[in-house]
Amino acid sequence: GVVTLNLSELQPDAAIWCTYKYLNGGPGSVAAMYLHPRWHDLPPGLAGWFGADKSRQFRMEHELVPAIGAGRLQLGTPHVLSLAALRGSLQLIEAAGVERIRQKSLQLTARLRQLLHEHLPDAGFVCATPEADHRRGGHLAIRHPLARQLSLMLRSRGFVPDFREPDLLRIAPSPLYSRFSDCDDLVVEIGRILAAGVEAVDRAQSLVT
């Protein structure tokens, strides 16, 4: 969804990924799997009815005839509403092209890094994400002693970063709909929060935001 990846060239035995982040499937969206053709006859370790050969799935035979490929590892019926949302997102991604999405993603994260450096040089931020494009994914991980407080306060102002222990603020602009002006607005809001004073946060609350 945000990094170009050619599994046919990489030739892994298998690959598993989520669809709720940069594929925009949302919380609870289905997982996905690639299985190399050399393993298409692999017996499923845990068999489910949805892993049966789709042409004979409703014959209700007592002997399971697995589907060909990764489909044989499916267990039950996937969540249809999640699939509907994911289908709409995948159509947009296909129309835009992953290469173009990747380029915009790199530009968005580079802009965020530049804005933080230019506008908040003495605020104590240290970017933990590599600067080189080929080593960077789709988000910036920024170290700051008040990262958790900043995450919570930004959420209350309409921005949705997240926090990871001990001091990481993660910012992930989605290239399909995030604008470069959104990066500007975020950094301005961070500056306002720091200027006003960061509120204390109860450490007994959840440590993930």
Can you say where each PLM-predicted feature lies in the sequence?
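Active-site core of PLP-dependent enzymes with the aminotransferase class I/II
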Residues: 1-6, 34, 179-182
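PLP-dependent class I/II
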Residues: 19, 52-65, 69-74, 129-134, ...
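Short, charged, surface-exposed secondary-structure boundary motifs
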Residues: 3, 24-30, 173
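PLP-dependent enzyme catalytic core of the Aspartate aminotransferase-like
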Residues: 148, 153-209
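Active-site C-terminal subdomain of aminotransferase-like
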Residues: 24-28, 34-104, 110, 209
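Conserved PLP phosphate-binding loop immediately N-terminal to the Schiff-base lysine helix
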Residues: 1-24
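Conserved small-domain helix->loop->beta segment predominantly found in fold-type I
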Residues: 69-76, 93-143
